Swiss-Prot record:
Belongs to the universal ribosomal protein uL6 family. This protein binds to the 23S rRNA, and is important in its secondary structure. It is located near the subunit interface in the base of the L7/L12 stalk, and near the tRNA binding site of the peptidyltransferase center. GO terms for cellular component: cytosolic large ribosomal subunit. GO terms for biological process: cytoplasmic translation. The keyword Ribonucleoprotein applies. Gene3D superfamilies: Ribosomal protein L6, alpha-beta domain. This is Large ribosomal subunit protein uL6. PANTHER family: 60S/50S RIBOSOMAL PROTEIN L6/L9, LARGE RIBOSOMAL SUBUNIT PROTEIN UL6M. Keywords: Ribonucleoprotein, Ribosomal protein, RNA-binding, rRNA-binding. Part of the 50S ribosomal subunit. HAMAP family: Ribosomal_uL6_B. The gene is rplF.
Length: 183
């Protein structure tokens, strides 16, 4: 039995879950999300709980069992509470601003980077004096939020010598000493 897959998912108040054909739809105060579920996995909704069951004990079905349980759990958490990620810009002259869903980044290149964010993701930028600028992203869809964060981070990944770049708040960057340390 999959240790993650066998755990039930509780449905909080204000969230409705429906299962039709092979699509699970979760509606809540933060929005609506849908997910395809492989026909080898059975979704049972009863008594305010969601249970996932698999037909056989094949290796692929064991992995799908845990996968779909995690995806549906993320959907339930997303539509009820939502997900939030914070990115920090470390570097001299690094700035971020937004006009609605258009994010403008100044990351030390000769040009500014403009990124149109999906409508499901809300963005807020903070720039305080003597602190690194922050980009705060919120969404009900955890997968989409992670993809957007990693896309922004890929514009200027933190480098190991000075630690400059776009990083998650609280992320530890593995630092290297320079050439002079070997002497």
């Amino acid at each position: 039995m999959s240790r993650i897959g066998k755990l039930p998912i509780s449905i909080p108040a204000g969230v409705t879950v429906s299962h039709k054909d092979e699509i699970v739809t979760v509606k809540g105060p933060k929005g609506e999300l849908s997910q395809y579920v492989d026909p080898r996995i059975t979704v049972v909704i009863e008594g305010g709980m969601i249970h996932l069951e698999r037909k056989t004990d094949d290796r692929i079905e064991r992995s799908l069992h845990g996968l779909y349980r995690s995806l549906i759990n993320n959907m339930v958490q997303g539509v009820s509470a939502g997900f939030k990620r914070e990115l920090e810009l470390v570097g001299v002259g690094y700035r971020a601003s937004n006009q609605g869903q258009l994010l403008e980044l100044s990351l030390g290149f000769t040009h500014s980077i403009f990124m149109q964010l999906p409508k499901e993701v809300t963005v807020e930028t903070k720039s305080e004096r003597n602190k690194n600028p922050l980009i705060i992203l919120e969404s009900a869809d955890k997968q989409l939020l992670g993809q957007v964060c990693m896309k922004i981070r890929s514009f200027r990944k933190p480098e190991p010598y000075k630690g400059k770049g776009v990083k998650f708040v609280g992320e530890q960057i593995r630092r290297k000493s320079g050439k002079s340390a070997g002497k």
